[in-house]
Amino acid sequence: MESKEFDDDKIKIISMTPKSEKSDKIVMQIVEEFINSFPDDRYKFRVLLKVAELICKNGLCNEAFLILDKIPDSYYKSSALYKMADILYRNKEHDRLIQIAEKIPDDYKKSEVLLKVVELLCESGKYDEAINIAEKIPDNYYKSEALFKIAETLSNKGYYDKAVEIAEKIPDNF
């Protein structure tokens, strides 16, 4: 089987294309053809992730999610979505982080992403939303971390009664 070289310059063309609805569609068609030219799933996964990262960094995050949905293997999909979540976390995009977390098949990685969402919500003072997200975390360790973060933040802000109420929800089995 013939091996294709991964060429960052070819993929970076995406980021230089002027943004418009028509150009976005053309870029996505080119990306589809490019991605489909890789027969090896492991290599295709890396290409899909790289393309999705570049597209998301250039404002096409919804399209990037569509690309990542094409990854058939749940392990690779979880890894790719987790890496995308890291980009969104650095950009403090908690709404998109929630969208990504819902798509992650692996509960452990999903829990890590939801913890990051809770951290961002606490930073922006959205405590009720943070509590709702924390309660949806499947892994008890990360749920404990999230609830602790909320309780600690509330306590530091002087909301002692609410902090105690949240602290009492922290699971002790993990």
From Swiss-Prot:
Pfam families: TPR_6. Keywords: Plasmid. InterPro entries: TPR-like_helical_dom_sf, TPR_rpt. SUPFAM superfamilies: TPR-like (SSF48452). This is Uncharacterized protein MJECL19. It comes from Methanocaldococcus jannaschii (strain ATCC 43067 / DSM 2661 / JAL-1 / JCM 10045 / NBRC 100440) (Methanococcus jannaschii).
